[in-house]
Amino acid sequence: SFAKTLDEIDADRIGVWGISYSGGHAICVAGLDTRVKFALSVVPVVDGFPTMRRCHGERKFAAIQKLILDDREARQRGEPSQMIAMATTDPDNEISSWPFPHVCTIFQDIKEREAPNHIHENTLESVELLMQYDVMPYAKRLYETPYMMAIAKGDNITSSDLEIDVFNAVPCPNKKLAIVEGVDHMSLYSNNEHLEKVSSAQATWLRDLLFGPDALLAQAAE
């Protein structure tokens, strides 16, 4: 609704594009709002419960579930939700939302280089909400909304098999899946060459969608 009020926005060609958690949100927004004319996701979070279960493993997952239940009771007593690290360099001994050391080091590097206000922690309530997150019902609503998903081959953070299941559930025939080799979930945040592999594939699809497949040839001829 806000985007349509902006002079620089073509209200007939509004789309959504997101990476990781916001990649899942792009599916949800497109499924909820028919004014969205296309959607693109990069390594999206698609189903929080199995994602967390896989990431933490059975024993760690049981421990974080216990923390979540304790946190519910604390919030009922009027206490704030407990803060935990988003990721740590020692996930075997320290609880975190995403138990991968390289997630911590990459985001700390981003904080030092370009995002000084980044705080590398979140509430347990946020983890609880993540475990309730499932984009599948919204993916099934994309009957006429063109959609593209780009995933990292073998992604062990957001689980490429879960992502492919969601892609296959999108009923719109105008959809494309790009499985990109030689990149991983976090390298898209830290390696511009890896990001370029994904963004170029999506940019090509988007250009063809909005301007037609001959757009590049016409541009080269000018």
Regions found by a protein language model. Give the residues of each.
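Catalytic histidine neighborhood in serine/cysteine hydrolases
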Residues: 170-186
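Conserved alpha/beta-hydrolase "acid-adjacent" motif
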Residues: 131, 156-162
